[in-house]
């Protein structure tokens, strides 16, 4: 039974990731005053299926000088971790109701760095290695602010269980009292998922495609699916943290519909940002984090810690 539950979670995630590629190409197309994919199937709806078939029937070529085991393990690990991070998400019921769901998600996102590092190093290509080093530095750096923002939000919620956030936000969305945190969180999720304008790992003019430059066919498709699964997961996480949906136990489908609409709108915002903004320089990316976001998030975290004490209130009870 548990295996059926897992499959019921994994298959829709992979399908959503596949169709997100189509949505992205369509959105970018219309924003650049062109049509986007419109040949394969009605309105190009079968394009992701055609892409998947093409990628998986191609021969997965491997550079002769690459490290075999790591080269193959890296994309499997990337997709495995991307899917694992969905386990504690309340939709409205999580797959496994964890006591420390938020910590689990932080740990899994930290492990994702290894798949990037392995792929860059095992490819035995200077472009892949430079791309991987950039990606690792960027991911590790932005995880610092993500963790502090999460801590601040959890201080208002009072529990590391994600389901508690639904109860906390029955009165008001946390985006209202914590809007500076929400803005910094959203920008940090863009950087964490290596999306434009922070997609320095795949600066086409410099590094061709970044850490996955030597990958082709199936393994490349695994990286691709991992990236899009992470994008959807991050937006769902944002919706849970700051735009909490109230859950009526008698009609759980209302929660799901509401939650999906919010996540979709946030995902569309990701695509809109990609169509609008140019890429940052690498030093600007690091300055934004270490000189702007980190001091601000630390100050706001201290503020949220001291607020209940100052107002003689009690901290949130779980």
From Swiss-Prot:
Instruction: Provide the family line.
Output: Belongs to the complex I subunit 1 family.
The reactions it catalyses are:
a ubiquinone + NADH + 5 H(+)(in) = a ubiquinol + NAD(+) + 4 H(+)(out)
Subunit comment: Core subunit of respiratory chain NADH dehydrogenase (Complex I) which is composed of 45 different subunits.
Q: Which organism is it from?
A: Bos mutus grunniens
Give UniProt keywords alphabetically.
Answer: Electron transport, Membrane, Mitochondrion, Mitochondrion inner membrane, NAD, Respiratory chain, Translocase, Transmembrane, Transmembrane helix, Transport, Ubiquinone
Matching PANTHER family, A to Z? NADH DEHYDROGENASE SUBUNIT 1, NADH-UBIQUINONE OXIDOREDUCTASE CHAIN 1
Example of a GO cellular component annotation carried by this entry: mitochondrial inner membrane
Where does the sequence pass through the membrane? Answer: 2-22, 70-90, 100-120, 147-167, 172-192, 222-242, 253-273, 294-314
Q: Could you tell me the EC number(s) of this protein? A: 7.1.1.2
Q: Please list the GO biological process terms of this entry.
A: mitochondrial electron transport, NADH to ubiquinone; mitochondrial respiratory chain complex I assembly
Which HAMAP family does the entry mention?
NDH1_NuoH
Q: Which gene encodes it?
A: MT-ND1
What is the first-listed, main subcellular location in coarse terms? mitochondrion
InterPro entries tied to this protein = NADH_UbQ_OxRdtase_su1/FPO, NADH_UbQ_OxRdtase_su1_CS
> What is the official name of this protein in its record?
NADH-ubiquinone oxidoreductase chain 1
Q: What does this protein do?
A: Core subunit of the mitochondrial membrane respiratory chain NADH dehydrogenase (Complex I) which catalyzes electron transfer from NADH through the respiratory chain, using ubiquinone as an electron acceptor. Essential for the catalytic activity and assembly of complex I.
């Amino acid at each position: 039974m548990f295996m059926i539950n897992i499959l019921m979670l994994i298959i829709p995630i992979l399908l959503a990731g596949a169709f997100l590629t189509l949505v992205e190409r369509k959105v970018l197309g219309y924003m650049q005053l062109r049509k986007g994919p419109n040949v394969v199937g009605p309105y190009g709806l079968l394009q992701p299926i055609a892409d998947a078939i093409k990628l998986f029937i191609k021969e997965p070529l491997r550079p002769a000088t690459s490290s075999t085991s790591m080269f193959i393990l890296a994309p499997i690990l990337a997709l495995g971790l991307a899917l694992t991070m969905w386990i504690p998400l309340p939709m409205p019921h999580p797959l496994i109701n964890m006591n420390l769901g938020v910590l689990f998600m932080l740990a899994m996102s930290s492990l994702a760095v290894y798949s990037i590092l392995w792929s860059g190093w095992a490819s035995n290509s200077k472009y892949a290695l430079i791309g991987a080093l950039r990606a690792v530095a960027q991911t590790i750096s932005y995880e610092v602010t993500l963790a502090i923002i999460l801590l601040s939000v959890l201080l208002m919620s009072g529990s590391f269980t994600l389901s508690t956030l639904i109860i906390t936000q029955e009165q008001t969305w946390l985006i209202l009292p914590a809007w500076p945190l929400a803005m910094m969180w959203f920008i940090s999720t863009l950087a964490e998922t290596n999306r434009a304008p922070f997609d320095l790992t795949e600066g086409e003019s410099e590094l061709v495609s970044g850490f996955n430059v030597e990958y082709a066919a199936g393994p490349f498709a695994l990286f691709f699916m991992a990236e899009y699964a992470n994008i959807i997961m991050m937006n769902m996480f944002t919706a849970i943290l700051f735009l909490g949906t109230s859950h009526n136990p008698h009609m759980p489908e209302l929660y799901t519909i509401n939650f999906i609409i919010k996540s979709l709108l946030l995902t569309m915002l990701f695509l809109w940002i990609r169509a609008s903004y140019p890429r940052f320089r690498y030093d600007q990316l690091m300055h934004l984090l270490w000189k702007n976001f980190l001091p601000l998030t630390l100050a706001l975290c201290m503020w949220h810690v001291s607020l209940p004490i100052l107002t003689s209130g009690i901290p949130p009870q779980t």
